[in-house]
Regions:
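Glycine-biased, small-residue-rich flexible motifs in mid-sequence functional cores and linkers
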Residues: 68-71, 79-363
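Short, small/acidic-rich helices and loops at N termini and domain boundaries
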Residues: 1-83, 251, 324, 348-350, ...
Length: 363
């Protein structure tokens, strides 16, 4: 670990653009750290204010403490030149020069962010959770900000699916904000996802850092789904960043009388894509609408089901058999269609026929 590179973003008044320039001309964090004042001004193009801030920070910073924090919290970092740096984020207007992370960074470009209001309604929570779950089951990574309300619902929904989910924090990764989501964040990491931040370890969650955080949420994804947002919601800042980066904006329509839907309904009026189902996202990007099924014992079947097969599968149980007649009533399918789909489910090994003629999920 280059502790110098990992420590430099903690210096006040050195923004992303400045640090990117420093790394491009000095090549390593150690060379930046040990550069003379003249070199920092001439090659690094630091202003007098930035120079004084860096010299003070360099003198007072406890590198050993930062190193121990990163070790204790299993915090890694990458720079723009590293292979693991998220590709979509790297190609934005203002990418973080150093990205800290806990867990595993996503390697796919099938990434969608879901954002929304903290004081979400039951409708908003249910919608966020369901869309995230269905997308995750179809190998789409869900990114959000880890806040209360819509963000948390999106992460929880994604955890019920197959793909990873990513939280973008507005503080150092040794901090937990909000504290109530500590267990959720640990589940995200355990599920193969990660928590990322552009802020050095030790940085508290300050208000001004949340809008800056939102550009990462927008930048590392193909599109942003806004689910419930007031007229001046932070989620609309994320949508603005998405527009700047040429990302797609999707909005879920809401109650026209509710304050919590004024922002999303406004987005729809000015041209955002209307999103009423996970299928709207899959259709927009031409992503295959198939998923892996997890049974109640959490055994994953590597069998791809069509939508009709999936509907039928959901009416089956692991422990209680269901008859053909019962399935006809519950699904409303024709007998010919039902028999054909049952045969396909049996051939794929996810459903078996019992000696009495009923059907159960294979164990």
């Amino acid at each position: 670990m280059d502790i110098y590179t990992a420590s430099i973003p903690g210096c006040p008044w050195l923004g992303s653009k400045t640090i990117r320039h420093l790394l491009s001309v000095f090549k390593t964090g150690e060379k930046i750290w040990n550069a003379t004042s003249e070199e920092l001004c001439e090659k690094g193009k630091l202003t007098s204010k930035q120079l004084n801030s860096f010299l003070k920070y360099r003198k007072e910073a406890d590198l050993e403490k930062i190193y121990k924090l990163m070790q204790n919290f299993n915090i890694k970092y990458c720079t723009l030149n590293d292979e693991v740096y998220p590709k979509l984020l790297a190609n934005t207007i203002n990418p973080p020069p150093v990205l800290y992370y806990r867990g595993k960074l996503p390697v796919t470009d099938r990434i969608i962010s879901i954002v929304g209001i903290r004081k979400a309604t039951v409708y908003g929570i249910k919608t966020a959770k369901e869309i995230a779950k269905e997308l995750s089951e179809r190998n789409v990574v869900i990114v959000s900000g880890g806040a209360r309300g819509i963000d948390s619902a999106a992460h929880k929904g994604a955890l019920e699916g197959k793909a990873a989910t990513v939280t973008v924090a507005a503080c150092g990764l040794d901090k937990t904000y909000p504290a109530e989501n500590r267990n959720l964040f640990e589940k995200i990491i355990a599920h193969g996802g990660c928590i990322i931040s552009e802020y050095a370890p030790g940085t508290p969650p300050l208000g001004r850092q949340f809008p800056a955080r939102n550009r990462i949420i927008a930048g590392m994804t193909r599109g942003v789904i806004v689910i419930e947002a007031a007229e001046k919601s932070g989620s609309l800042i994320t949508a603005d960043f998405a527009l700047e980066e040429g990302r797609d904006i999707f909005a879920v329509p809401g109650n026209i009388w509710a304050e919590s839907s004024k922002g999303t309904n406004k987005l729809l009026k000015i041209g955002a894509f209307c999103c009423t189902s996970y299928e709207d996202i899959l259709s927009e990007y031409g992503w295959e609408n198939k998923k892996e099924i997890k049974c109640k014992k959490d055994k994953t079947f590597n069998k791809q089901l069509t939508l009709e097969e999936e509907v039928l599968y959901r009416f089956c149980s692991e422990s209680v058999e269901i008859t053909e007649d019962e399935l006809l009533i519950k699904t409303g399918m024709s007998l010919k269609t039902l028999k054909s789909l049952l045969l396909q489910l049996q051939l794929k090994g996810v459903v078996i026929q019992t000696p009495s003629g009923g059907f159960i999920i294979s164990g």
